[in-house]
From Swiss-Prot:
Family: Belongs to the HypE family.
Organism of derivation: Azotobacter vinelandii
Entry superkingdom: Bacteria
EC number: 4.2.1.-
Gene coding for it: hypE
Modified residues (S-cyanocysteine): 341
Annotated pathway: Protein modification; [NiFe] hydrogenase maturation
Keyword Transferase among record annotations: no
Catalyzed reactions: C-terminal S-carboxamide-L-cysteinyl-[HypE protein] + ATP = C-terminal S-cyanate-L-cysteinyl-[HypE protein] + ADP + phosphate + H(+)
This protein's name: Carbamoyl dehydratase HypE
Pfam families recorded: AIRS, AIRS_C
Entry function: Involved in the maturation of [NiFe] hydrogenases. Along with HypF, it catalyzes the synthesis of the CN ligands of the active site iron of [NiFe]-hydrogenases. HypE catalyzes the ATP-dependent dehydration of the carboxamido group attached to its C-terminal cysteine to a cyano group.
Amino acid sequence: MSRLDLRNGSVEMVHGSGGRAMGQLIEELFARALRNEWLDQRNDQAQFELPPGRVVMATDSHVISPLFFPGGDIGSLAVHGTINDVAMAGARPCYLAAGFILEEGFPLADLARIVESMAAAAREAGVPVVTGDTKVVEHGKGDGVFITTTGVGVVPPGLHLSGDQARPGDRILLSGSIGDHGVTILSLREGLGFEADIGSDSQALHGLVAAMLAAVPEIRCLRDPTRGGLGNTLNELARQSGVGMQLVERAIPVREPVRAACEFLGLDPLYVANEGKLIAICPAERAERLLEAMRAHPQGREAAIIGTVVADEHRFVQMETPFGGSRMVDWLSGEQLPRIC
């Protein structure tokens, strides 16, 4: 049997049949790129030891369009997104599983590029992909490739971060500028050209989280503002904790190209997706120390204290404008940017 034609070949239905062709796809493409001691065993599952602590599991499905974009692709995004979901519990991400839905006719060169990007992201993060699965659907029944990743991590004993832990008086911190990922994807999709000055912020944040917890173990909540952006995520946290939030608009970092693109497109950057930022809520007396720790880390250099948790039975999120007024930051109504991750 000849080797896979990774330059000119494409995915065929036989690649999902469970036979020799599927084995060849796994061996010559997936296993070669993602190689590690668990995958090398060629079992249908991975067996591993975990350090002491509570086990955290998160799963995420990725349907982003386009598949490739400045700052990443669906492969690296699948790794980063799931690692970040695990890390927001304060956990150390340990292992990943990946499932691929491939469309018949999808170029093998593009698939190889995606898998190699996934492998590079996993290596950089130190979180291996230890098991996986591949299915093929008929041409026209998919959209190239969809990826589902599941992550397993461990929370150290004594640590408990949750979205229901915010208390009145706490400070709200943001790790950096918002809207980069969403504007990049929309601009590329519509051929607007803004992505040349921006690029996705997709990155794994567990290193930043570890540095933050080492400095301020009293952190109450962590959350990454992905779909729905900062505005939706803060409403989620307010609802979970039964509190209100008061933001300061001028304190929220937004890069000028993102601000300009949002004004042109009629978007509010508060609701534009991010893939490499986090929100932290901590006691007021520890906020400056946490800010210092975040800014000392490469992924938190633009960090800012953006608001305060307040007592509010209605659980409203409100924002002070630069002109001294106040406006409601409500839940996003409808879908502002579909297939953003």
